[in-house]
Each structure stands twice: as structure tokens, then as C-alpha cells.
Amino acid sequence: MNDSEEELEQQGSQEDISSSQDTSDEKEMRKQDALYAQLIEYREIVSELRRSEMKNLCIQLYCSYKAGITRRNELQSDLDGYERRIPPRLRAVWPTIHSIPDESFFDGTSASRFRQEAAYLAVRLASKKLHKLGRMASSEELPNPDGLRYLVERLQIKLERLFDSVDTFRQEQGSKSMQSRVKPMDWKILYGLARVTNGSFSSSQKADVLALGNGTRACQSLFKEMSLQPSIDIEKVSHSNPEISIEFED
């Protein structure tokens, strides 16, 4: 092998090394950009939490999923002409100040949407009950408008009391730090708060267990005794212990 061939071979190997280094550098730059974008997003989150006096962050969380997808799609296009794909695990899922919707939007639509979803739930419960009985659901056997409205109103009352108790519990935690506001609520706590009577909740695990069983029986009795009619005898679904009874009226 002459000197010219050796020089060409060395030049080719150097080009290969340089090309691999460029590819590695591009990947590293994309990763750094993704991490930097995530850092900026977390900084916005902390800034928003410090400025906001609200303890209830449900409004921000409401549209976080769609807002996160939108931000991710915006970052996929790069000026160099190739798609910059950012791994989902590198993206923050908590909403930032840019994804907070207008609160007035929920004031006019949340109640109607809730009632609509509750009505769908009542129909599904009725269909499931008929299916367990080996009967096909028909328009005559599904709840009539009055009966459906009654189910929705009862469900709304119970959920509103539960949500009020959850909010009361979070407020009584006392701390205003970000950790207590962002800390997720354990399901066991939520089950305990399900024992709701006029907005109160218990601190006794035994009472909570009894209340859950009592609530289940009350719901089953409500569905059974109602017979798809708009009226119901409340005494038939109440139990002897007044502390753990679940009311169906305000």
C-alpha cells in the first residue's frame, strides 16, 4: 500500500469519526433543549403557585392533558427542517400559566355538563342492573324522565357533599406551602370523606368502614325501592344508627 492510499484511508476514517461525533452532538443538543424546556416549564409552575392564593388547583388541572399535547406538538417542528421528537418522559405534565382556562367558561357550562354525565351514569347503572337480571334493556324499562331526574339530583347532592368535605379537609390541613397544596390525596382519605352527612366527615376508621357498607346498601335499596318511579320512601333506605346514616334529602 502506497502513501496516497494510506492517506485516503486515514481521511475516510477521520470523516466517519467526525460524522458519528456530529450525530452524537445533535442528540445531546436535542436532549439539552428538551431538559431546558422542561426546566422553564417547572419554573413557570413554581412561579404560578407562589403567586396564586388558591388552594384548589382543579381549574388548572382540568385542561392540562390537552395543553401538554399542544405544547409538545409545537416543539416538534425545528427550524433546521427535521422533526424534533421529545420523549414524553422529559415533558412536564402539570399545567403552566399558559394553560389556565378562563374561569367564566366553567361557570356557565359545568353544571349542565355534570347533569348530563350524571344522567348517562344513571342509564348505564340501570342497563347493568337489567343485564345482571338477564333482561334486555328497553325504552320502557329504562328510567323515565322523572325517575332519571330524581337519580341525577340524588347523585348530585351526594357528590357535592363529598366535594365540600374534601375541600374542607384540605383547608384544615393548615399549611400554605406548595408541598401541602400539591400533595396528592390518598384514596383511603377520600373513602373516609365519603361518610358525608351535612358536610361533615369522621376521623374514625371503624365508622368509615360502617359508613361505606351503609352507603352501599342505601344505594342498592334506592335503586330497588325506587322501581323507576320519582318517589321513594326514605325510611326504607335509612338504618338504625343515625351517625352513619346517609340522607337523600337536604
Swiss-Prot record:
Superkingdom, natural source: Eukaryota
GO CC aspect terms: cytosol; nucleolus; RNA polymerase I upstream activating factor complex
GO molecular function terms attached to this record: RNA polymerase I general transcription initiation factor activity
Major localisation: nucleus
Region (Disordered): 1-30
Alphabetical UniProt keywords: Nucleus, Transcription, Transcription regulation
Biological processes per GO annotation: signaling; tRNA export from nucleus
Compartments it resides in: Nucleus, Nucleolus
Family: Belongs to the RRN9 family.
Function: Component of the UAF (upstream activation factor) complex which interacts with the upstream element of the RNA polymerase I promoter and is required for the proper accumulation of rpa1/nuc1 at rDNAs. Required for nucleolar localization of condensin.
Binding partners and assembly: Component of the UAF (upstream activation factor) complex. Interacts with rrn5, rrn7, rrn11 and ssp27.
Name listed for the protein in its UniProt record: RNA polymerase I-specific transcription initiation factor RRN9 homolog
Organism: Schizosaccharomyces pombe (strain 972 / ATCC 24843)
Designated gene of the protein: acr1
